[in-house]
Amino acid sequence: MVTGVFAALGFVVKELVFLVSYVKNNAFPQPLSSSEEKKYLELMAKGDEHARNMLIEHNLRLVAHIVKKFENTGEDAEDLISIGTIGLIKGIESYSAGKGTKLATYAARCIENEIVITKGGCIHPSLIRFNIYGVRIHNGNFFHDKVNNCFFIFKSMPPLFVMNNEILMHLRALKKTKKDVSLHDPIGQDKEGNEISLIDVLKSENEDVIDTIQLNMELEKVKQYIDILDDREKEVIVGRFGLDLKKEKTQREIAKELGISRSYVSRIEKRALMKMFHEFYRAEKEKRKKAKGK
């Protein structure tokens, strides 16, 4: 769960909130013409911030369109819009006209990929995500994401798209099935004919050691960015994600401890995560600049 904190954010928190409000209220600027889009892409390539913002704002309707695909999954619409907006920003910033793909097509894929990768198996019936090492699946296909150290296990292998040297997964929505996948879903039978579920396959003698190693690695990442938060934000994030190596708490539990409302805890959590997202993105951008300079 800690890994999800590090979805790269390509925009400052204030701007992201502003963009999300656009989508929530369906207040979309008109799409750019081909000539306008080309002009702004050329200006953005030269470092023009206004051009970048224009490209993002005038493609916000793509976020609303993609989010509708996930409206029956039980996920919070505001969360999906926020994640989709991050995907749009990544798409705009990484787009290359020389690859022959239209900006809208590329951005739409990035939006859907961001939602699927961030939400994982709980959101899409064709994907199950496990943040665990050493898993062997005998029934089904799997893909190992080396960046986030997690496995993606598919009931049927979806198409893969390669963009900017990163493997991005574009999963076609299943029209007939829109229910969550449970770890207790049957995936086959053992030699005696007994039904085997996913949770049975994942059990191993070393799972406690494996989980501890992974958690410690992720905690080291979090420690790099948690100091930018104020005391209240730290308290909420530590409790919610179990960063003190204790049980993760619900927003309701934290609200009771702090004597505030659950909705206020939710706002604090989102604000804190956005701060961490932005700091992570800034740090990664600096790393890329240094790498290019070598």
Curated annotation (Swiss-Prot):
Span(s) of short sequence motif Polymerase core binding: 79-92
Top-rank taxon, per record: Bacteria
Region Encoded by spoIVCB, annotated ranges: 1-156
DNA-binding region per UniProt: 251-270
Pfam families named among the record's database cross-references: Sigma70_r2, Sigma70_r4
Proregion residues excised on maturation: 1-20
Region (Encoded by spoIIIC): 157-294
Region (Not present in recombined mature factor): 114-165
Gene3D superfamilies noted in UniProt: 1.20.120.1810, 1.20.140.160
Swiss-Prot/TrEMBL keywords: DNA-binding, Sigma factor, Sporulation, Transcription, Transcription regulation
GO biological processes: DNA-templated transcription initiation; sporulation resulting in formation of a cellular spore
GO molecular function, one term: DNA binding
Record's function text: Sigma factors are initiation factors that promote the attachment of RNA polymerase to specific initiation sites and are then released. This sigma factor is responsible for the expression of sporulation specific genes in the mother cell.
NCBIfam families (alphabetical): sigma70-ECF
Family the UniProt entry places it in: Belongs to the sigma-70 factor family.
Additional remark text: The spoIVCB gene is an incomplete structural gene that is capable of encoding only the N-terminal half of sigma-K. The remainder of sigma-K is specified by another gene, spoIIIC, that is about 10 kb from spoIVCB on the chromosome. The intervening fragment, called skin, is excised at an intermediate stage of sporulation thus allowing a full coding gene to be produced.
Protein name: RNA polymerase sigma-K factor
Taxonomic lineage from the root: Bacteria, Bacillati, Bacillota, Bacilli, Bacillales
